[in-house]
C-alpha cells in the first residue's frame, strides 16, 4: 500500500492516486449498493418488494440533492473537503441503523393507502428516513469525485468495481444473516472502507470517531430492539406469514435464509390450503384428511401448501383437486411436473402415474424437502422417492432441451400465489407461462399427451386467466395450423382456480363427455370444450358491465354505451339458455369462443383490462390497466389492489421526474451569473448526462429481467448482472484513460458501438438466451458473462471521459452538476424499465437505451467546449483532442 494521502496533498489540493483511496472508495460504494439491496430485502420480507423498490428509488434522489448543494457551495466544500468527507463517512453507519430502526416503528399498510391518509405520510416517512444514509454516502463520494477530478476514470473504476464485487458479497451474506440482520452487511463494508480512508490520512481522530460510530451502530442494531421491545423488522399484518404466526397452535418447524428466499414452514390445525378443491369434497368423502398441509412461506408470502403423504384410504381426496383432470383420461402415464412448489401436483401424480419427473429451480426448497427430518417424514420423503426423478433447475428449460416425451405435463400454480396478494404484486417475470414456454410444453407431449395448466382465478373482473387463455391459444396456433377447437378443455372454480387442458391431437368425444361429467360432479364451471354453447347476445352486456364496474362515474367512460358485436363464426346468436353463469364465467366463455372462432382482437380492445398473451419479451401478469386509462383510475385504486405494484411504478416515475427537475435547475438558478453563464452548451450537457444515466440503468435493470430467461432464478440473474455490468464497466472506465487525448475522434465510435450492440440485443437477445438456457448451468453462467462484457466494457467509457474532461477544463461546477443529472436520470430510467417492458416488451428497453447512447453523441461535443478565452486553469491538463 502506498503512503498516506496527507503526504501528497494539501488541505486544498486534489486527492492523489493511492491504493488506500481506491479501496476505500470501492468499499464505500459497495456499502451503498449493499444498503440498497438490504432495504429491498427488508421490504420484501416485511411488506411487499415493490414498496422497497419505490423507497430505494426515491431515496437515491439523495445523490441529486447532494450534487445541487455541492454545486452551489462548491468553494465552501473545497475548503473543508477533508472534514466533510470524514464526517459524512463516519455518519453513514449510525444513520443506516437509526433510519432502519425508526422506519420499522412507522410501518405502513398497503391495504389502507387509499382510504387512510396517514398511510401516505408513513410511506413518506420511510422515504425520508432511508434517504439519510444515502445522503451521507453521496456527500462522501461527491467530495472524492470532486477532489479526484483529474483521475476520475480511476476513481470511477474503483467505484464501479467495488460496487459490483460488494453486491456479490452481499448476496453471499444472505446465506448467513437473517433478513432482520442484513443491515450488518453494509455496516461491515462501511467500517472496512472507513478504516482504509482514515489510515491513509494517518488520522487518529478519524479512526477513533469511526470506531465509536461503528460500536454505536452495531450495538444499537443488536441491543436496542430487545431493550425497547421494538421490532428489527416489522412484518405487515396482511402478509401471509402473519396469519400463520397468530394461529393458537402455530409452530414454526423450519426456517432458513439464503439468496433464494427466507423460507419458513409452519404447522397448525387451523391451516387449510387446498387450491381449487371442490366444495363437494366435504360432504362426499367419508373423512377429510386432517392436518393435511404445512404452510411454506417464502419472504413471508404464501402459503404454498406442503401436502402430507396420505394413506391409501384417503387418496380419494386427490380426485377433488383440479390437478386430477388429466388422469381422468390418461391411465398410468409418464408425468412431468414443471414446478414442485409444495408438492401437491407431485403427490397427485405419484398416485396416478407410472413414472414422475419433477423440476424445482429453487435450491432452498429442494434442500428443505430433502434434508429436514420433519419435512421428509411429513411428505413421505417425496423428493427421495425412487419413483421420482428430480430436475434441479427450471422445468421450462428442461422441456425446451429434452428429447423425452411425456403423457402428462402439469404446471399448477407455479409462482402465482401473489396474483391476489392484498399488497398487490411487483412486475415479476413469469417465463413459465409465456407463449414460448407453452409451446415447449406442447412439443414435449407424446401423441395424445395432455398439458394441464392451473392458475389462480381470484380476480373479479378476471385478468390473469384471460392472459393465460390467450397465451395458450397463441402457443397452440404456433405449433399447428388449422382448426384447434378440439384441442382444449377449460374449467374454473369461481374466485379459486382455473384449469386449461390441451391435448396433442385433440380430445375424443368420449373424453370430452368424461371431463364434462367430472366438472359437473365437482360443481366447477365449464368454460370451454368442443360443443359448449355460448350465447353471443350477452357479449355487449358483459363487456359494458365490466367497464361500468371500473369506470362508474358519469362522463368517465365514453365507450361504456352498449355496442352490438357481431357473432363470431355464425350468422345468428345462439339460442337463449336457462342457465345464468356468473359474469366471470361468461367472460371466460366469451374469451374462448372468440379465441377459437375468431374476433378476439375486437373483444380485447373493448375489455377493460389488457389481455395480451405472455411472451418471452413481455412475460408479465401485471400492467393490466391500459395506459390510456391510467388517468381514470387514480381515484379508484381500491378497485385495483393487485395492480398497486404496477401503478406505483408510474407514481415513482412521476415523483422522480418532479423531484429531479428542481434538483437539476436549482444550481442553474442560483449560480447562473457566477457559475453557469460562462459555461457553453449547457442544454447539450444535460442531454448527455441524462442519456448516460437513463441508458446505463435501463440496460442493467432490463438485462436482469432478460437473463432470467436463461438462468431461471432472479437471485442468480441479479448477481450475474450486478457483478458483470459494474466490474466490466469499471474495467472500461480504467481503460478509457488512454483515449482521453483522442476523445473527440474515439468517443463517437464508442457511442455508435454501444448503440448498435444494444439495439441488436433488444431485437435478438431473447432467442440467444433461449438457446443458452438449454446448456449446462456452468456454461450458461459463462455465456451470460460473455454477453455482458462487450456492451458493459464500452459503457464504462462515456462517464469518466466526460467527467475527466470537465475537470481538466476547469469546469468544476459543471462537473458536480453533471454528476447530479446522471444520478437523477438513473432513478427515472429505473422506474421507466418495467413500464416500457410491460407495454412494449423487454427488447424495447434495450432499444431505447441504445437510442439514448446514440443521442449522447450530440451532447458529448458540448462537454469538450472550453471556457470563454479557451484557457483552462493553469493546474489543469490540456483539453482532449
Label each PLM-derived region with a short phrase.
Residues 2-881:
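Alpha-helical transmembrane segments of multi-pass membrane proteins
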Amino acid at each position: 500500500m502506498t503512503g498516506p494521502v496527507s503526504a501528497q496533498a494539501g488541505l486544498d489540493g486534489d486527492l492523489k492516486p493511492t491504493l488506500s483511496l481506491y479501496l476505500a472508495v470501492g468499499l464505500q460504494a459497495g456499502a451503498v449498493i449493499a444498503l440498497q439491496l438490504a432495504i429491498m430485502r427488508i421490504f420484501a420480507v416485511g411488506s411487499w418488494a415493490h414498496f422497497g423498490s419505490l423507497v430505494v428509488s426515491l431515496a437515491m434522489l439523495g445523490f441529486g440533492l447532494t450534487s445541487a448543494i455541492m454545486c452551489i457551495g462548491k468553494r465552501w466544500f473545497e475548503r473543508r473537503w477533508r472534514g466533510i468527507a470524514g464526517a459524512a463517512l463516519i455518519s453513514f453507519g449510525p444513520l443506516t441503523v437509526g433510519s432502519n430502526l425508526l422506519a420499522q416503528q412507522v410501518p405502513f399498510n398497503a391495504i389502507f393507502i387509499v382510504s387512510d391518509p396517514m398511510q401516505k405520510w408513513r410511506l413518506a416517512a420511510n422515504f425520508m428516513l432511508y434517504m439519510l444514509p444515502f445522503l451521507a454516502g453521496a456527500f462522501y463520494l461527491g467530495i472524492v469525485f470532486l477532489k479526484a477530478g483529474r483521475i476520475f476514470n480511476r476513481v470511477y473504476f474503483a467505484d464501479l468495481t467495488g460496487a459490483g464485487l460488494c453486491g456479490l458479497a452481499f448476496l453471499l451474506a444472505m446465506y448467513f444473516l437473517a433478513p432482520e440482520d442484513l443491515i450488518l452487511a453494509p455496516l461491515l463494508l462501511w467500517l472496512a472502507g472507513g478504516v482504509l480512508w482514515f489510515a491513509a490520512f494517518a488520522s487518529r481522530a478519524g479512526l477513533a470517531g469511526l470506531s465509536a460510530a461503528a460500536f454505536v451502530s452495531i450495538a444499537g442494531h443488536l441491543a436496542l430492539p430487545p431493550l425497547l421491545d421494538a421490532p428489527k423488522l416489522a412484518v405487515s399484518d396482511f402478509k401471509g406469514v402473519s396469519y400463520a404466526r397468530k394461529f393458537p397452535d402455530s409452530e414454526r418447524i423450519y426456517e432458513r435464509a439464503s439468496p433464494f428466499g427466507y423460507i419458513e414452514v409452519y404447522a397448525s390445525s387451523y391451516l387449510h390450503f387446498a387450491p381449487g378443491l371442490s366444495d363437494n369434497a366435504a360432504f362426499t368423502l367419508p373423512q377429510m384428511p386432517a392436518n393435511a398441509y404445512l404452510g411454506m412461506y417464502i419472504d413471508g408470502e404464501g402459503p404454498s401448501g406442503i401436502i402430507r403423504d396420505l394413506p391409501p384410504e384417503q387418496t380419494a381426496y386427490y380426485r377433488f383437486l383440479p390437478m386430477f383432470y388429466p388422469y381422468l383420461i390418461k391411465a398410468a402415464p409418464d408425468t412431468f411436473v414443471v414446478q414442485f412448489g409444495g408438492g401437491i401436483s407431485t403427490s397427485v401424480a405419484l398416485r396416478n402415474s407410472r413414472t414422475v419427473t419433477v423440476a424445482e429451480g429453487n435450491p432452498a426448497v429442494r434442500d428443505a424437502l430433502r434434508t429436514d427430518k420433519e419435512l421428509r417424514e411429513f411428505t413421505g420423503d417425496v423428493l427421495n422417492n425412487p419413483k421420482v426423478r428430480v430436475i434441479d433447475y427450471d422445468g421450462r428449460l428442461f422441456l425446451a432441451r429434452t428429447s423425452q416425451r411425456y403423457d402428462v405435463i402439469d404446471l399448477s400454480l407455479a409462482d402465482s400465489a401473489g396474483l391476489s396478494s392484498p399488497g398487490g404484486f411487483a412486475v415479476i417475470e413469469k417465463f413459465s407461462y409465456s407463449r414460448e414456454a407453452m409451446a415447449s410444453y406442447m412439443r414435449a407431449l407424446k401423441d395424445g399427451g395432455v398439458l394441464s395448466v392451473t392458475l389462480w382465478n381470484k380476480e373479479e373482473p378476471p385478468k390473469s386467466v384471460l392472459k393465460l387463455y390467450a397465451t395458450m391459444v397463441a402457443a397452440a396456433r404456433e405449433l399447428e395450423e388449422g382448426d384447434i377447437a378440439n384441442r382444449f378443455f377449460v374449467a374454473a372454480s369461481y374466485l379459486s382456480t382455473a384449469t386449461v387442458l390441451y391435448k396433442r391431437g385433440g380430445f375424443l368425444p368420449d373424453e370430452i363427455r368424461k371431463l364434462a361429467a367430472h366438472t359437473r360432479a365437482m360443481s366447477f364451471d365449464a368454460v370451454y370444450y368442443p360443443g359448449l354453447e355460448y350465447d353471443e347476445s350477452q357479449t355487449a352486456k358483459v363487456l359494458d358491465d365490466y367497464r361500468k364496474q371500473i369506470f362508474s362515474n358519469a362522463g368517465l367512460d365514453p365507450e361504456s354505451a352498449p355496442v352490438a358485436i357481431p357473432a363470431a363464426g355464425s350468422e345468428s346468436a345462439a339460442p337463449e339458455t336457462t342457465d345464468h353463469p356468473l359474469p366471470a364465467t361468461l367472460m371466460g366463455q366469451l374469451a374462448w369462443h372468440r379465441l377459437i372462432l375468431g374476433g378476439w382482437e375486437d373483444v380485447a380492445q373493448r375489455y377493460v383490462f389488457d389481455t395480451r398473451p405472455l411472451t418471452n419479451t413481455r412475460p408479465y401478469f401485471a400492467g393490466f390497466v391500459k395506459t390510456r386509462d391510467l388517468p381514470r383510475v387514480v381515484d379508484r385504486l381500491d378497485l385495483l389492489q393487485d395492480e398497486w405494484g404496477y401503478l406505483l411504478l408510474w407514481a415513482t416515475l412521476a415523483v422522480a421526474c418532479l423531484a429531479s427537475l428542481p434538483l437539476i435547475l436549482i444550481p442553474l438558478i442560483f449560480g447562473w451569473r457566477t457559475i453557469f453563464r460562462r459555461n457553453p452548451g449547457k442544454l447539450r450537457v444535460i442531454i448527455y448526462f441524462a442519456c448516460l444515466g437513463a441508458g446505463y440503468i435501463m440496460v442493467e435493470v432490463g438485462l436482469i429481467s432478460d437473463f432470467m430467461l436463461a438462468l431461471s432464478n432472479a437471485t442468480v440473474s441479479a448477481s450475474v448482472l450486478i457483478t458483470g455490468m459494474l466490474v466490466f464497466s469499471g474495467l472500461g472506465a480504467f481503460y478509457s484513460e488512454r483515449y482521453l487525448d483522442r476523445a473527440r475522434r474515439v468517443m463517437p465510435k464508442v457511442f455508435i458501438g454501444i448503440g448498435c450492440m444494444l439495439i441488436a440485443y433488444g431485437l435478438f437477445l431473447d432467442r440467444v438466451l433461449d438457446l443458452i438456457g438449454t446448456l449446462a448451468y456452468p456454461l450458461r453462467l459463462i455465456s451470460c458473462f460473455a454477453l455482458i462484457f462487450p456492451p458493459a466494457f464500452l459503457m464504462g467509457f462515456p462517464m469518466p471521459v466526460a467527467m475527466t474532461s470537465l475537470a481538466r477544463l476547469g469546469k468544476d461546477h459543471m462537473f458536480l452538476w453533471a454528476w447530479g443529472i446522471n444520478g437523477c436520470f438513473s432513478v427515472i430510467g429505473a422506474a421507466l424499465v418495467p413500464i416500457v417492458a410491460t407495454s412494449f416488451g423487454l427488447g424495447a428497453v434495450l432499444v431505447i437505451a441504445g437510442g439514448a447512447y446514440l443521442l449522447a453523441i450530440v451532447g458529448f461535443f458540448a462537454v469538450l467546449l472550453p471556457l470563454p478565452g479557451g484557457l483552462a486553469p493553469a493546474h489543469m491538463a490540456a483539453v482532449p483532442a
